[in-house]
Amino acid sequence: MLFRSNESFARVAVAAFITHLNPTLEELADIKTAVSEAVTNAIIHGYENLSGYSRHGESIPAYSIVHPGKVRMHCVLEGDMLSIEITDQGKGIEDLKKAMEPLFTTKPELERSGMGFAFMEAFMDDLEVESTPGKGTRVHMWKKMRCGDWIGKED
């Protein structure tokens, strides 16, 4: 599926971004897991804004390759704080409080667990989600990095 390759690319990109910080394996796994959840959700729901197409009388899933939406990831390191922002131009989230409840999913047919936001909260130090129905969603995550021995850090 399309979102698998994009989700994998995002995980590799964020790993490359933090490599010079010499992260622990736990930090690296935590960040990659949180990014994976955020990007997968953005791709699945980001494409939904482009629904309404059909082929042979059968509805085409909005997350399909036919009309992809944009998903952006922005990473910044300020001091020892890593900031990662994932945005989409999807349909947005009608009930954000409900969507952030563990096990809540709007995509049971995709075998989604409904644990995306719970994983993001568990693996990152802080999480902020903003969403506007019809416009899209912004997920902003922060993690304090153990930056004592950066690779290439000047003494």
Q: What feature does the model see in each segment?
A:
Residues 42-155:
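Conserved beta-strand-loop-beta-strand hairpin that lines the nucleotide-binding pocket
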Residues 11-12, 97:
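Conserved strand-to-helix beginnings and helix N-cap segments that scaffold or border functional pockets
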Residues 12-37:
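Conserved short strand/loop->alpha-helix "switch" segment adjacent to the catalytic nucleotide/phosphoryl-transfer site
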Residues 1-2:
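Short, small-residue-biased leader/transition segments that mark boundaries at the very start
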